[in-house]
Amino acid sequence: MATLPITCPGSPTGCNSHTGEGGKKPIELNHTIIPAKDKWASAQFLADILNLEAGPEWGHFVPVKTDNGVTLDFSDSTDFGPRHFAFLVSEAEFDAALARIRAAGVKHYANFRRERPGEINHLYGGRGVYFDDPNGHLLELITRPYGPTPEGG
């Protein structure tokens, strides 16, 4: 595998200030754009479920920032297909979000095939739930990261 040189134009110290353990810069997801029929309504829907803040509007986007610093930038669009977004949450956050989903009358499912309506799953010793946002994007909340083999489906 080829290694590309990392350069930081204008930096007197090169990229050392951007490197992590072993001199390698940690790779992190910073943001993603989520197409929406109504960017404000979609951003607010997610923010309400996850108990986060939507906005303020930034250019073409309405951002929702997660606790680990990833920004979901909602943008008005008319031409898009459904996407999937999974959020790792604590047990307490899961309980609160599931209560908000149910209180809002949002249909939820135990798996991505939208089977077992009204149920949750217990994969990998945790809990998970799937539900659609107003644009048809499939959202997922999990309390444990998934591994190579599902357990407790």
For each of these PLM feature ranges, what is it?
Residues A2-C8, T13-K24, L29-K37, T78-G153:
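Vicinal oxygen chelate
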Residues I27, I33-L72, D76-T78:
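Core segments of cupin and vicinal oxygen chelate
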Residues A43-Q44, D95, E140:
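Alpha-helical elements of the RecA-like P-loop NTPase motor core of helicases
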Residues P63-K65, R83, G118-I120:
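Short secondary-structure boundary/hinge segments and terminal tails
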Residues L72, F80-R83, G147-P150:
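A short local loop/turn or secondary-structure capping micro-motif enriched for an aromatic residue
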Residues S75, L88, I142:
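A cross-family glycoside hydrolase active-site/sugar-binding cleft signature
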